[in-house]
């Protein structure tokens, strides 16, 4: 039976880990044991934060809409309720963009929402 030397495969594996650990602080970037655990942890954070990112952005959009709508004398909850009753289906991402960049359009939407709530 021939002797199997695994230098090439282990070097390739280590190289892969070190590539993922690039930019890490201290030993975590250049010793395999520390780098492996740091990369594994970073992947866990990656997975978790891809989910959290969606929540964070939705919260940001809601804050922007709320700020824009309150300037026009209405609360976020009443505004969303009014839009629903008026049959206007615009998602929060677009509404926040409108609130930031197009105040006239937001004002028109608020008026529509108020009219729908009054009816």
UniProtKB/Swiss-Prot annotation:
Please give the Gene3D superfamilies that the UniProt record associates with this protein.
Answer: 6.10.160.10, Ribosomal protein L20
Q: Which family does it belong to?
A: Belongs to the bacterial ribosomal protein bL20 family.
Q: Which InterPro entries match?
A: Ribosomal_bL20, RIBOSOMAL_L20_CS, Ribosomal_protein_bL20_C
Free-text function comment from the UniProt entry: Binds directly to 23S ribosomal RNA and is necessary for the in vitro assembly process of the 50S ribosomal subunit. It is not involved in the protein synthesizing functions of that subunit.
Protein name, as recorded: Large ribosomal subunit protein bL20
- Indicate whether Acyltransferase appears among the record's keywords: no
Task: Give the matching Pfam families.
Answer: Ribosomal_L20
Designated gene of the protein: rplT
UniProt keyword list: Ribonucleoprotein, Ribosomal protein, RNA-binding, rRNA-binding
Q: Which GO terms describe its cellular component?
A: ribonucleoprotein complex; ribosome
Q: Does the keyword Glycoprotein apply?
A: no
The top of its lineage is: Bacteria, Pseudomonadati, Pseudomonadota, Alphaproteobacteria, Hyphomicrobiales
Q: Which GO terms describe its molecular function?
A: rRNA binding; structural constituent of ribosome
Origin organism is Azorhizobium caulinodans (strain ATCC 43989 / DSM 5975 / JCM 20966 / LMG 6465 / NBRC 14845 / NCIMB 13405 / ORS 571)
Q: Name one GO biological process term.
A: translation
* PROSITE patterns the UniProt entry points to: RIBOSOMAL_L20 (PS00937)
NCBIfam families in UniProt: rplT_bact
């Amino acid at each position: 039976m021939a002797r199997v030397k695994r230098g090439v495969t282990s070097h390739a594996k280590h190289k892969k880990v070190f590539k993922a650990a690039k930019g890490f602080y201290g030993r975590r970037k250049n010793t395999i044991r520390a780098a492996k655990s740091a990369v594994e942890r970073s992947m866990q954070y990656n997975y978790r934060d891809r989910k959290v990112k969606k929540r964070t952005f939705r919260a940001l959009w809601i804050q922007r809409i709320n700020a824009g709508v309150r300037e026009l004398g209405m609360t976020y909850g009443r505004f969303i309720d009014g839009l629903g009753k008026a049959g206007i289906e615009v998602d929060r991402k677009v509404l926040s963009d409108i609130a930031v960049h197009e105040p006239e359009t937001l004002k028109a939407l608020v008026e529509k929402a108020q009219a729908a709530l009054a009816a």
